[in-house]
Amino acid sequence: MKQKGLWFSRHAMTEEQKNSLGDVEINQINKTIHSAKELKAEIEANDIIAIVAPIELQREFLELAGDKPVITAVNDRVLVPQQDGTEDKLEFHFRKWERLIKIEIEKEDYIPS
């Protein structure tokens, strides 16, 4: 049976990213959320949770996903010189997926001296 993958990102998943996951049906969610709880039903309906999100949202996704893998893409940032001499273009080249295991956030007030 084909696995289902949730892709939470503003950008489309690249072919390289898709291919590296194997036979997975990707369902993209491209919207602003304040809490991963807003996507609880979608998280429950998918087998793999792939996200591009701030650390606090990553922690929430990890909590809600239970034993399901929550993964993030690792990319190389490559500056590509432009033929016309304009500013170099930034490209992201996919390297691998990393599975989030645990996220602890510890904060304190910062008061400049």
Explain the meaning of each model-derived region.
Residues 1-50, 57-113:
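Long, low-complexity, Lys/Arg-enriched
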